[in-house]
Amino acid sequence: MYNWTNKKLTKAIALIILVLWLVVLVGILVWALTTQHLKVLYGWLLPFPFVALSVVGLLKLGDFFEKFKHLSKQRVTVFFGSFFVARYLLYLIPVLLAFFIRPQYFHVIATIISTLFFPLLKIVISFAWLPLEYHCKNLISKLNKKHVTTGDSFKRT
């Protein structure tokens, strides 16, 4: 998977994810307002603060992880384990809100889909970005490498 400590690429990926999510949200907004399906619209709008929080967290994640270099490995492992569990609980909050707080106002399926859209898009982009980044780095390193002839490349008679 992609190395999220590379700050420039992480910012680019986070902004791509946010823009794609906003494009989908605007499409749903136009569809819901033209067909009067406001429950679906509310279902899609409910996870938006959590997605924005996740994007901000993704942008600041590299700096945050660098602070843990001096701690022991066991403490860091415990922290990261709880961090990843808490991240998925953060994605669960909008679904629980839509399900328990007046279900007639929120379309629960739209809330689930829009909540899952962000982490799935992050996974897809990171797995698509990794081979592209690897290929580009190899291509650049091959272009910058100068060919130096050595004695091993000559035929010996």
From Swiss-Prot:
Chief location: membrane
Cellular localisation: Cell membrane
Domain of life where this protein originates: Bacteria
Keywords, sorted A to Z: Cell membrane, Membrane, Transmembrane, Transmembrane helix
Keyword Zinc among record annotations: no
Membrane-topology annotation of the record: Multi-pass membrane protein
Signal found in the keyword field: no
Gene Ontology CC: plasma membrane
Membrane-spanning ranges: 13-33, 39-59, 81-101, 112-132
Protein name as it appears in the record: Uncharacterized protein MG406 homolog
Organism ancestry: Bacteria, Bacillati, Mycoplasmatota, Mycoplasmoidales, Mycoplasmoidaceae
